[in-house]
Every structure is written in structure tokens, then in C-alpha cells.
Amino acid sequence: MALRFLGIDPNTGDQGSPTVWLDDETGDLVIQSYKADAATLAACAEVGSVPGHSTDVPEHETVVRLPGYMLQFFPKP
């Protein structure tokens, strides 16, 4: 895996904070951010996605909350 650092929360201290990397081999974004709280998970389940798709988050997935200002680090197509 060839990750390339894209950006970190500019207001970060020396503890964990939102960070974005790009996997140059797959084009995937790898994101470190805040765990979604129970209210956010419930809202995701209520809104859903496509008809008939489960609203449960499988064990191999998670939901994170990325602050909007971190979008500045996402590559433009």
C-alpha cells in the first residue's frame, strides 16, 4: 500500500485529529476522524440509502464524522 499524506486538521495538537491520506495504488481515501456518536448512527439508519439496503453498519465497516473544513485536503478529479 502506497499512502500519500494529504492533510491534517490545521488546529491539531499532538493527540489524534482528522487526517486524510490517498492510496496511490487504488485511489482510495483513508480517513482518520471522530467516531460517530449514537445520535449520528441513528440518523444514518433513519435516513437510509437505497430502498431495500440494510441500515445496519457491518462489523467490517464504521461511520466517522469528518469536519467539513477537511474537504480542502481532498484531491480534485
Residues of each region from the PLM?
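A short, structured beta-strand/loop element
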Residues: 14-56
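A residue-level signal for beta-strand positions that form part of recognition/binding surfaces
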Residues: 3, 28, 63
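Short, charged/polar N-terminal "headpieces" of proteins
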Residues: 1-18
